[in-house]
């Protein structure tokens, strides 16, 4: 018998979240999605099977409302550009998320982080992803942290960028970052 506890998914409009939600529904879970713009969820075939809470994870009241009655919360939020401003925003969101999860007595947070060596010279984006995991892990709510390198699949930003370039350019001059070591997940 499927567990009918309520699960919160943040980042449901993203690549991973958009694929996670239907799997949770297929497993018999009730799903709530927090979205800054709830209309963006209307494009997903499962949108009428989930509860949608409009709000911003930077706003404590939005998180508190979204977490009421939830047993597990998926943290799939991240700054897309990766600059210092996004890094600071990510950390503020993580603090808010952890505090709200504690108040709501969430049983578990599941966080999708990045596979990094924290002793290396990290970009602001990677540093903030690592620190976000740290902030969540040291809250009073148990955390399962999944760490991935690049996630590549049809529809992912990286896949679409590579497809776009290879369809239009017969020869590419590769920038320095192209030669960085990576462990992609397909």
Annotate each language-model stretch with its function.
Residues 39-104, 114-119:
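NAD(P)H-binding glycine-rich loop region in Rossmannoid oxidoreductase-like domains
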Residues 10, 34, 76, 109-115, ...:
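SDR active-site strand-loop-helix element
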Residues 103-108, 140-141:
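A short helix->loop->beta-strand "cap" motif at the edges of active sites that frequently abuts
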Residues 29-36:
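Conserved glycine-rich Rossmann-like NAD(P)H-binding loop of the short-chain dehydrogenase/reductase
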Residues 121-149, 154-164:
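Active-site Tyr-X1-5-Lys
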Residues 19-23, 100, 135:
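Rossmann-fold NAD(P)-dependent oxidoreductase module
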Residues 2-29:
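N-terminal Rossmann NAD(P)H-binding glycine-rich loop of SDR-like oxidoreductase domains
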Residues 164-185:
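A conserved pocket-lining segment of Rossmann-fold NAD(P)-dependent short-chain dehydrogenase/reductase
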């Amino acid at each position: 018998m499927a567990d009918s506890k309520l699960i919160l998914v943040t980042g449901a409009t993203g690549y991973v979240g958009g694929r996670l939600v239907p799997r949770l529904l297929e497993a018999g879970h009730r799903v709530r999605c927090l979205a800054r713009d709830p209309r963006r969820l209307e494009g997903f075939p499962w949108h009428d099977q989930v509860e949608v809470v409009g709000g911003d994870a930077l706003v404590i009241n939005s998180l508190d409302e979204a977490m009421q009655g939830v047993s597990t919360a998926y943290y799939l939020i991240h700054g897309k550009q990766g600059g210092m401003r996004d890094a600071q925003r990510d950390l503020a969101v993580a603090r808010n998320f952890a505090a709200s999860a504690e108040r709501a007595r969430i049983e578990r947070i599941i966080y999708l982080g990045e596979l990094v060596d924290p002793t290396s010279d990290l970009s602001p984006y990677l540093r903030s992803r690592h620190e976000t995991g740290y902030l969540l892990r040291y809250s009073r709510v148990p955390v399962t942290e999944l760490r991935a390198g690049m996630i590549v699949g049809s529809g992912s930003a990286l896949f679409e960028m590579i497809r776009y370039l290879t369809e239009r350019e017969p020869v590419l001059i590769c920038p320095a970052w192209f030669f960085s070591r990576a462990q992609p997940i397909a």
